Design a protein with these regions (language model features):
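Bacterial Sec-dependent N-terminal signal peptides
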Residues: 1-20
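Extracellular/lumen-exposed scaffold segments
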Residues: 28, 52-110, 217-251
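Beta-strand-rich recognition/accessory modules
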Residues: 268-348
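Beta-strand elements of well-folded, non-transmembrane domains
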Residues: 143-149, 162-166, 179-183, 200-204, ...
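Beta-strand-rich N-terminal accessory domains
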Residues: 18-86, 176, 191, 329-331, ...
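Active-site/ligand-binding surface loops and adjacent short beta/alpha elements
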Residues: 191-277
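Extended, loop-rich substrate-binding clefts of extracytoplasmic carbohydrate-active enzymes
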Residues: 85-169
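Acidic (Asp/Glu-rich), glycine- and aromatic
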Residues: 45-50, 56-60, 167-215, 226
């Protein structure tokens, strides 16, 4: 009898961890591609154009249980959430200083203090392919980075592969982005704001009882006010064991955000890859909901002890690889270490 019970327990665990099918639903009218896992909506590759967003994003992002883990503002605002940094939308990849142009802070609602910046825009070009099997789905897209707020020179060509997977209680996204220089010389200046990021729901912020002021590389300040902390439960922990706000500017192979939404645990973990520039990367993870990894911001994060300007000559490329896990449960350090190891082996 004990053997039967043990067998059934193992069978149950195996079923829970089994990958579900991934499918895609194209919506040309709304300029998005919906991603479904196990028949349930997960996210959309959203490319509405520069009149709405200055880059394509994954938005919104839901957990396996249907909990929305991304902030709604400015696309679909929800009551009680912050309305700072309108360029923080869903999940994205861009950078603050490429040949002197700011791709990170660009939006349709640039605050007055940023209006002197020279902005850049990332244009969605094409969906190259979508394909699925029983356990994963792959979406391949291209884009072009253009300076002078999208009216100037083509600077970089982008090819991004998204790989989606999920189980009954997890969702996983791999983003592999290759940037190739179109200009004769492309310089990613060592600055704070970049590179791969998610803007999280209010409930996943770290509770705070004081206002904050954040300053960018140009000395521009952004004020983040105090809000009601009811239901706010977020906290960070890094692969190195550092917790809370202290993770900002530290280096780690992975970073996990823990919290509670809809009365159950939510974990959102981002994994760096050994082949990435500056591995293990610096983390630009803030308590107010910005969860970012920036391999090129060494000067700011190390107080000037380290500098990581990246230069590409025409035709040269750089690839960034990140895995994101959204779990409707708490993940242990050993589980996250194992996922990090698997990511390193599975993606080259």
């Amino acid at each position: 009898m004990k053997k039967i019970i043990l067998f059934l327990t193992l069978l149950s665990v195996g079923a829970t961890a089994q990958n579900q099918s991934v499918s895609f639903k194209k919506n040309d009218a709304e300029k998005k591609i919906d991603v479904l896992i196990g028949g349930k909506y997960f996210t959309s590759y959203f490319y509405p154009g520069e009149s709405v967003l200055k880059k394509a994003v994954l938005f919104p992002i839901l957990s396996a249980k249907g909990t929305t883990i991304t902030r709604g503002y400015p696309i679909a605002p929800r009551a009680g959430e912050r309305t700072d940094h309108p360029h923080h939308v869903g999940m994205w990849l861009n950078y603050e200083d490429v040949n002197g142009y700011d791709y990170w802070n660009n939006s349709t609602a640039i605050v007055k203090s940023l209006q002197s910046h020279k902005m850049g825009t990332i244009f969605h070009d094409a969906v190259l392919s979508t394909k699925s099997n029983k356990s994963t789905g792959e979406l391949v897209v291209t884009a072009t980075w253009v300076d002078d707020d999208g009216k100037g020179q083509k600077v970089l060509s982008e090819k991004t592969t998204y790989v989606f997977s999920g189980t009954s209680d997890t969702r996983t996204v791999d983003r592999i982005t290759t940037l190739t220089a179109i200009s004769d010389l492309v310089v990613f200046k060592d600055v704070k704001d970049g590179m791969f990021a998610i803007r999280l729901a209010r409930q996943l912020e770290i509770p705070s009882n004081k206002p904050d002021v954040f300053t960018d590389a140009h000395g521009v300040e952004t004020k983040v006010p105090v809000l009601d902390n009811t239901g706010v439960s977020g906290d960070y922990i890094s692969s190195e064991g550092i917790k809370g706000e202290a993770v900002w500017s530290t280096r780690a192979t992975w970073m996990n955000l823990t919290g509670v939404m809809d009365n159950h645990p939510i974990n959102v973990a981002i994994f760096d890859h050994p082949s990435n520039v500056s591995y293990p990367s610096y983390w630009h993870a803030r308590g107010y909901g910005l969860f970012a990894v920036n391999p090129l911001g060494a000067k700011v994060f190390s107080n000037g002890k380290d500098v990581r300007n990246l230069t590409l000559k025409k035709g040269e490329s750089v690839t960034f690889r990140y895995r994101t896990l959204i779990a409707d449960k708490n993940m242990s350090k050993s589980e996250l270490d194992l996922m990090q190891s698997k990511f390193a082996k599975e993606v080259k």
